[in-house]
Amino acid sequence: MARMPSAERRRQLTEAAIRAMARDGVAKTTTRSIAAEAGVSLSVFHYCFDSKQALIEAVITTLTDHSVTVVKEALRPRDTLEETVAAGFRAYWDHVRAHPEAHMLTYELTQYALREPGFEHLARRQYELYGEAYAELIEQLRRDMDLELRVPVSVLARYLAAMTDGLTLNYLVLGDAAAWADILDTVTAHIAGLVR
């Protein structure tokens, strides 16, 4: 096994944990199965992560980063605010449809953290990350498109996180991809209405 900087090894183990957890479930994923998935010894795993909490926090952060990166790449100013917002949501939705197992894992991680004593703060952190990501995207759009919001950024960010969360869960449960176009139009029109 080649030596690798610890930050890179942590990323490797985090991605392996995401694959193992998405496949086997959070509760059934062990440190051994993650090490095997990454192709490293168990001692390497324990060198990189001193607790299961640290691993789960890394998984939550990485999953959030995956989704945010997809949206950021798509969210560049277009001719209208509606087109810009629609492009961001479309990119996110394409990610959900392409990686449903990763998005299911986010809900499983939330439930696991809420039920596991001492892990509750990780569920809170997960949703704080969602709000922070939306606030950053909103601020970027506000600057780039010279927008004036009708509500504070923090309120809009939390609202968008809750709405996206609900839409994602609805899709994962019902699997109605055909309905997305109408939903996207409704969401886009509503968001545009929150801007002057």
PLM regions and their residue ranges:
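Solvent-exposed, amphipathic alpha-helical segments
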Residues: 16-23, 70-74, 105, 109, ...
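Short helix-capping/turn signature of helix-turn-helix
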Residues: 49, 108-115
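Amphipathic alpha-helical packing segments from all-alpha helical-bundle domains
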Residues: 68, 98-104, 117-143, 185
